[in-house]
Amino acid sequence: MALVTLGINHRTAPVEIRERVAFTPERMAEAFSELRAASGASEAAILSTCNRTELYLAGDDDCAPSVLRWLAGFHELDVADLENVLYVHRDSDAVRHMMRVAAGLDSMVLGEPQILGQLKDAYALAREHSATGSFLSRLFEQTFSVAKRVRTQTAIGENPVSVAYASVSMAHHIFADMSRNKALLIGAGKTIELVARHLAEAGVRSFLVANRTLEKAQALAEAHGGKGILLSEIPDHLSDVDIVISSTASPLPILGKGAVERALKKRKHRPYFMVDIAVPRDIEPEVASLADVYLYTVDDLRQVIEENIRSREGAAREAENLISSGVQDFLDQLRALDAVSTLKVFRQRAELLRDVETEKALRALRNGTDPETALRSLARGLTNKLLHQPSVQVRKAMAEGRTEVTECLRELYQLDALEADEPTTTEKL
């Protein structure tokens, strides 16, 4: 079974490409069905976040070109648009890549924990669509185990830094005393939950949470003494807030330039701080052209995030060692499973030959053959049958100069020990 990973991330592709390659929840069922058909893979999983889209495939090692064409077609892109930003990992490199992603070593924010939850969600979604089998299931479980060891045995998770944390950190550049500011959070997912927590820790006391589902908005808002509203109510409240941070799975922008312009007039040009964490973007890019609006995307957060990376570099080196060990453990598991499978087939073949020769001997006995003659014929026939195919392959290997085959045979049957123990002609006499 070959493992192939294809993807783009914040290092290889700008947000303009990433948002077009992101998978929306509404199209996941369609994506799984088409992906497996296009790739010929027996197992598949899809990870789609604001910073990366990755496809994990178990099956044909040559599926990368067909998957690239499918990915471009599914998102209505030219293949050329993706070729220069797409990376491909195979087999052990793909295993290492997944483990590094899960541990946060490949994230924009080194060591950030959210990606592990997102990877678990991707695995659950693949299982929900019956897209995984024993191979990917074993890989995901091993990956989660390694990520847990990285989290508990290194300092990679200390000094919390994330896209959510970086967003709040940047707000301090605009507002020195954030206790005077009111925040509007658009969305109610895990990232927005983190944003709300960091804003509260930074001193923000007034919250609005807007979401497509009012109940979710209210639940998150009430946890921080705020108010939940529907997305359609945002224009009514926009002029009252100073900070807008958005992270939804909407395929279309939620906040447009016109709505912000009208709110600015009511605010008498008091500044807005906005961060659009979503991919595809929730806030129209044209909003950035407005005076008194400071709009940032996930790519703009890179500088803030890089300042925090240095504190985690030592822990990252320790994490890499744990991951190397995890990769080796997984490969050892696969080899052990392959050995079990091979031995099972080997035994089945031997038992089949035994049954054939036993039936011959029984027929001979029923026909009146002397029992000793029948037994000797059974032993001779079974020996010949068991040794015929290995003998043919050994002769072929020797003719081709592949001496390692005979070395393997000598090791399997301990022939050197047998030769050493065999008595000489004189001893036999």
Curated annotation (Swiss-Prot):
Q: Which gene holds the coding sequence for this protein? A: hemA
Catalytic-site annotation from UniProt: 50
Protein name per the record: Glutamyl-tRNA reductase
Q: Which reaction does it catalyse?
A: (S)-4-amino-5-oxopentanoate + tRNA(Glu) + NADP(+) = L-glutamyl-tRNA(Glu) + NADPH + H(+)
Q: In which pathway does it act?
A: Porphyrin-containing compound metabolism; protoporphyrin-IX biosynthesis; 5-aminolevulinate from L-glutamyl-tRNA(Glu): step 1/2
E.C. number, please?
A: 1.2.1.70
Q: Which organism is it from?
A: Marinobacter nauticus (strain ATCC 700491 / DSM 11845 / VT8) (Marinobacter aquaeolei)
HAMAP family associated with the record: Glu_tRNA_reductase
- What taxonomic ancestry is recorded? Bacteria, Pseudomonadati, Pseudomonadota, Gammaproteobacteria, Pseudomonadales
The extra comment attached to this record reads: During catalysis, the active site Cys acts as a nucleophile attacking the alpha-carbonyl group of tRNA-bound glutamate with the formation of a thioester intermediate between enzyme and glutamate, and the concomitant release of tRNA(Glu). The thioester intermediate is finally reduced by direct hydride transfer from NADPH, to form the product GSA.
